[in-house]
Amino acid sequence: MIKFSINKTAFQNALKITKQAIGSKVTIPALTKLKIEVEEKGITLIGSNGQISIKNFLPADNKDASMLISGTGSVLLEAAFFENVVSQLPEVTLEFIEKEQKQVLLTSGKSEITLKGLDSEIYPHLQEISEGSSLKMKVKVLKEIFTETVFAVSTQENRPIFTGVHLETLSTGELKAVATDSHRMSQRLLPLEDTDLKFDVILPSKSINSFKNVFTNDEEEIEIFISGSQMLFQNETISYYSRLIEGSYPDTNRLIPNEADYTLDLVFDAAQLRHTMDRARLLTVMTTNGTVKLTVSGDSVVTTANSPEVGSVHEELTALSKEGNDLSISFNPEYLIDALKVIKAPEVRIRFISNVRPFTLQPRNEESGFVQLITPVRTN
């Protein structure tokens, strides 16, 4: 039967990470539980919501954990309640003792709390991924790619393939990450080190958002495996599984204009442009079409927004450079603000074809393989 003592902070941190995969709205009641497996070599915490699964291993020789294991076994505990109980324990160290009929006694200082557990045999078997070809990447790089694309996914569940980020290895030795909700698109290309792993998958946005909270050390390297309908991200102690979205992602390369198609090329200070859009948005949220108009005439660049109920906004913008024809185009400022949020460069390049064709954004003077596309709104 299980018996161990452990540093409360180390255990609590592991609990917090594992609980990222445990949800209250699940079809299988056992998935609201935390599975605890104790072996002589260490403690494994397991959580899953059917879409995301996390195995978090605390090795017995972890110095921060100050772990002492004197009994092994496994048990299920109500995840949310157990985490709250552990957080309220008074001392630095907690002791975990399994009693008869899967009851668990937690002691810390003068505090004793008894919890009702369940047999771990009722917990669903989690599909494993056999370790074969893999791709190694720094957490920081992967987070950047996800941040630069995930905001553009669709929130409409009736088109599931657009609710995730499309990840594909190309014959050019690059990783392509792209997301679109059909109104905007964000695409990032990243050169890869030598890898035999080839894939063309759609990773759900919910998995991406949880990933950022699970792998907190940006400088560490993780290994990526793919098998069938699952993707595995793994470091020395954490295995993070995600189900993939079924279906074929459309070819988004055809959406990106050819260089010869552009008729207007503008460069702006990214921060100034974002502040201008923020001010315009204050008014556009009060209008039915929610659009701002950008008018380029000679050396003049002006943004305007009008609301019969509230008023109007008129602001002159300074273009750092301008090449091409005059243009007047309307669009949703929210999309441009979201796009600018993920561009780290101080200057942004925006290129247009016409007032009814999508326009593109890229960091200026940066061959990063990062391009975004926004569809304009037709107005009378």
Curated annotation (Swiss-Prot):
It is found in: Cytoplasm. Pfam families: DNA_pol3_beta, DNA_pol3_beta_2, DNA_pol3_beta_3. One of its GO terms (molecular function) is DNA-directed DNA polymerase activity. SUPFAM superfamilies: DNA clamp. Keywords: Cytoplasm, DNA replication, DNA-binding, DNA-directed DNA polymerase, Nucleotidyltransferase, Transferase. Transmembrane segments: none annotated. Its main location: cytoplasm. It catalyses: DNA(n) + a 2'-deoxyribonucleoside 5'-triphosphate = DNA(n+1) + diphosphate. Its EC number is 2.7.7.7. Coiled coil: none annotated. This is Beta sliding clamp. The gene is dnaN.
